[in-house]
A protein has these predicted regions:
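Beta/alpha (TIM)-barrel catalytic core signal, keyed to glycine-rich beta->alpha loops juxtaposed to Asp/Glu
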Residues: 144-331
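N-terminal binding-site loop/beta-alpha segment at the start of enzyme catalytic domains
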Residues: 1-82, 133
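Conserved beta-strand positions
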Residues: 18, 55, 85, 137-140, ...
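Active-site groove signature of glycoside hydrolases
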Residues: 127-147
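Short, acidic/polar
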Residues: 32-45, 113-129, 178-182
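N-terminal small/glycine-rich loop or linker at the start of catalytic domains
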Residues: 9-29, 84-110, 139
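Active-site mouth loops of central-metabolism enzymes
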Residues: 23-36, 105-120, 146
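Acidic (Asp/Glu)-rich catalytic clusters
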Residues: 71-78, 128-131, 160, 182-191
Length: 342
């Protein structure tokens, strides 16, 4: 496993991150697996040299953080791993996240967002669930239009100064919003973000327009989520019936229907499949190799419900694509509506 700096920071992270959203309770999402099924996956990830583990307080309403903390204490030393979590959404099983379908329950005051009150309460609750006295990377899950940017950045700075987080990161927002937050931090001598966790894969490349160039210019590391487009790039959907998934997640993941399956998306999967067959590797490995090789990308966040899936992702780091192969994969792309910021 190779290790690289997270953006312009001195923090060394593996070229693959294990996403912990898959681990928790099926009460939250039907495709989530419980702790016993997660145990061998986390153990294997540590054995393979993965040191970056990404979760969030809202995943399974805190259950993901609890599992993350217990399994990492079982299989790794605290000083050898990088724990990342997030704040913004309500921590309640009734709330599935900003992109989840269906009616949204009424939010109670201060149960979400990025106010000083919310951030201070959320970091303490996350640390308790994780069973640690600090997180390495504390990320804001979304931009909060209801809280002054100055208030949010000062609160995050105080979390770092209190020793409860080593670095801060952000996720899924417009480039102008992220630039504004970084500017406020710099102007006021506050802690700046070292990472951006954004929606980026072969069938969703809208981040290449503004966010990625900005991050590369400013030394912000990219930690893309959904590198396989929720399994689509691995082949979990058929063109003739995109609503009939081939995996447990595909059969129940209504968010994917909102994000993907345009006509051009299937053309990308066809190009991906042809190249994978020619190279003698899986579709997923080609998709990971393309993403890991994009300028500015530090580590794709890989979700896994089986051990072989994390092994496959790590092997993908050895797959090097030529300029001609990259062009072959990218040629069918068509613009998409901007999705993932809600």
């Amino acid at each position: 496993m190779d290790y690289v700096n997270l953006g312009a920071s001195g923090l060394k992270v593996s070229r693959i991150a294990l996403g912990m959203m898959t681990f928790g309770t099926p009460e939250w999402r039907p495709w989530v697996i419980e702790e016993e099924a997660a145990r061998p996956i986390v153990r294997r990830a540590v054995e393979l040299g993965i040191n970056l583990f990404d979760t969030a307080d809202m995943y399974s309403a805190g259950r993901s953080e609890e599992i993350t903390g217990r399994l990492l204490r079982e299989f790794a030393r605290r000083d050898e791993i990088v724990i990342a979590t997030k704040v913004y959404f309500p921590v309640d099983l009734a709330f599935k996240g900003g992109n989840a379908p269906g009616p949204k329950p009424e939010r109670r005051p201060n149960m979400s967002g990025l106010s000083r009150k919310r951030i201070f309460a959320a970091i303490d609750a996350s640390l308790a669930r994780l069973g640690t006295d600090y997180v390495d990377l504390y990320q804001i899950h979304r931009f909060d239009p209801d809280t002054p940017v100055e208030e949010t950045m000062e609160a995050l700075h105080d979390v770092v100064r209190a020793g409860k987080a080593r670095y801060i990161g952000a996720s899924s927002m417009w480039a102008w919003q992220f630039a504004k937050m970084q500017h406020v931090a710099e102007r006021n001598g506050l802690t700046k973000f070292v990472s951006m966790q954004n929606h980026y894969n072969l069938v969703y490349r809208e981040e290449e327009r503004e966010m990625i160039p900005f991050c590369r210019d400013q030394g912000v590391g990219l930690l893309p989520w959904s590198p396989l487009a929720r399994g689509f790039l691995a082949g979990n959907r058929a063109k003739d019936d995109a609503t009939a998934g081939a995996t447990a997640r595909a059969k129940t993941d209504e968010i994917a229907l909102k994000f993907y399956y345009q006509e051009g998306d299937f053309a990308i999967v066809d190009a991906l499949s042809a190249l994978a067959a020619a190279r003698g590797v899986s579709n997923a490995q080609i998709a990971y190799a393309w993403l890991a090789g994009r300028p500015g990308v530090t580590a794709p966040i890989v979700g896994a419900s089986k051990v072989w899936q994390i092994e496959e992702a790590v092997r993908a780091l050895d797959v090097k694509l030529s300029a001609e192969e990259i062009a072959q994969l990218e040629a069918p792309y068509r613009p998409h509506p901007v999705l993932g910021h809600a």
